[in-house]
Amino acid sequence: MNLAEENTIFKPLYSLKHSSINAYFSKNSDDFVVRERPLYEFSGKGEHLILHINKKDLSTNEALKILSEQSGVKMRDFGYAGLKDKQGSTFQYLSIPKKFESFLSNFSHSKLKILETFTHENKLRIGHLKGNSFFIRLKKVMPSDALKLEQVLMNLDKQGFANYFGYQRFGKFGDNYKEGLEILRGKKMKNIKMKEFLISAFQSDLFNRYLSKRVELSHFANDFSEKELLQIYKISKEEAKELKKQEQFFKLLKGEVLGHYPFGKCFLCEDLSAELERFRARDISAMGLLIGTKAYETGEGLALNLENEIFKDALEFKAKMQGSRRFMWRYLEELKWRYDEEKAHFCIEFFLQKGSYATVVLEEILHKNLPE
């Protein structure tokens, strides 16, 4: 990002080219359901009590406050694998010290239910989940739009999707990355958690901008000639030829950082032909930069040039951030859908690995920005 343009709220490019689809979506507890999938089975023994809860139209923090008030558990003693959105119905797991079990025996709340409990050896930590399954109901869908939805879903199932950070990451007005930048420039903030969150929003915004640049490159590689690619990216004839040869939508680049999919270590793309085979088999994927001192460094070539274009003005703040890598390209799993023509409802279900946003997938499907 050119920091001179930091006041521009960024809208990422879509990977698919269809026109927008008419459908009504409301993120409520009937039409948006999230089910967290644990990373491991709970052991049935230990000093921690795992609560399987269902919350409706409550944020995770609001649910914790309710439980804290009725049980006496301090907020810091709760464990959870991930924060969930306020809107919708969410099934997720929390942990508390087992000694508080008796205080929850008479728990009752209209928007929060404890479905079952387990015992386990350790407290739940951020990231202790495999991912989330989603149910989304679209309304006011006419038959012609239902056909478009089916085609789009088949395309997404085949090619995957750009793993952008969702609008939730950037606050109500979509611009909290600006506050993160101000903190990096020296603005003081006492709330450590909020400070870290705002800085991460700045990192996330840069990640989205770089991923959008890669989506643009992939479109150009499909649509333009080798000669035009030479002029746009100032690359060699061999590099342009390699781009044109790649049949999958998202193009890999020699010298970029890859990772074993869906979990695994980072490494550099040195043998492009070999890595393309593994990418098409969904064994590896490309990793985008969350800028910081601990992030795996890109090697060379066009990947490095494009990265520098986005991140060059943020390098002066690199030492203030730890950084990491995040998958740029991911895949829908367990995808299914059904259309009820009489009700004009189109229901979609899928599973996403942890860290991916269902709303990002829905924006790609509908070609509309959320929330509307």
Curated annotation (Swiss-Prot):
The active site is at residue 85. Its EC number is 5.4.99.27. One of its GO terms (cellular component) is cytosol. One of its GO terms (biological process) is tRNA pseudouridine synthesis. Keywords: Isomerase, tRNA processing. Signal peptide: none annotated. It comes from the Bacteria. GO terms for molecular function: RNA binding; tRNA pseudouridine(13) synthase activity. This is tRNA pseudouridine synthase D.
